[in-house]
Design a protein with these regions (language model features):
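Small beta-barrel nucleic-acid-binding modules, primarily SNase/OB-fold domains
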Residues: 1-168
Length: 168
C-alpha cells in the first residue's frame, strides 16, 4: 500500500481510509463500479468503487464496463482500502487484486478508468490519486478507448438525472 499511503478521504464527514487485511471474492456485479464480495468467513459486503462512475447497465457501454470489471476481478482474491460508507450502506473502496506476491499496485478503480470503462467522478473523487486518474481518463479519451469511442458519451450521473425526469 506504499503507493497509496497518502490517500485521504474527503473531509465531508468521512473517516480516514482503512486498509482491510481480509481477502474477498466476487459474488456478483451490478455494473462496472458496484458489486458484492464475500470474505473467508462467508460474510458479504456491498462495494462501490471509490472515485469513479461507470455507465449504468441500461446505458451505452454499460454491459462492456461490467464485462471489463468481471475480467479483472472474477475468480481473483481481492483486498479493499475502505474510504467510507455511502448513503446506501455500501463500502466505498479502492479495490486491489491480491495474490501470493502481494497486492497489485494499480487499483481496479484505476484500471476501469484507464480502459475507458468509467469516468472519474469529480464530485466524490477528492483524494490525491484522482489527479492521476483524470490524466488517465484524458488519455483513454484521446485514444478513444471503451466508452470514449462515442464522440459525446453521457456521464452516468447525467443519465440517471434524465431517467428520473422521464419517470415524473
Amino acid at each position: 500500500f506504499n503507493s497509496i499511503k497518502n490517500i485521504r478521504a474527503s473531509s465531508a464527514g468521512k473517516s480516514a481510509p482503512v486498509a482491510d487485511e481480509r481477502e474477498y471474492r466476487l459474488v456478483r456485479a451490478s455494473d462496472g463500479d458496484s458489486f458484492v464480495l464475500k470474505d473467508g468467513n462467508g460474510r458479504t459486503i456491498r462495494v462501490r468503487l471509490y472515485g469513479i462512475d461507470a455507465p449504468e447497465s441500461r446505458q451505452p457501454y454499460g454491459k462492456q464496463s461490467k464485462a471489463h470489471l468481471l475480467s479483472l476481478i472474477q475468480n481473483r482474491p481481492l483486498r479493499l482500502k475502505t474510504m467510507y460508507l455511502d448513503n446506501y450502506k455500501r463500502t466505498v473502496s479502492l479495490v486491489y487484486l491480491a495474490d501470493k506476491n502481494g497486492i497489485d499496485e494499480l487499483s481496479v478503480n484505476q484500471r476501469q478508468v484507464q480502459a475507458g470503462m468509467a469516468w472519474v467522478y469529480d464530485y466524490f473523487c477528492t483524494s490525491d490519486i484522482c489527479k492521476t486518474w483524470k490524466l488517465e481518463e484524458a488519455m483513454a479519451r484521446k485514444e478513444r478507448l471503451g466508452l470514449w469511442q462515442d464522440s459525446d458519451p453521457t456521464p452516468p450521473w447525467q443519465w440517471r438525472r434524465e431517467q428520473k425526469k422521464k419517470k415524473k
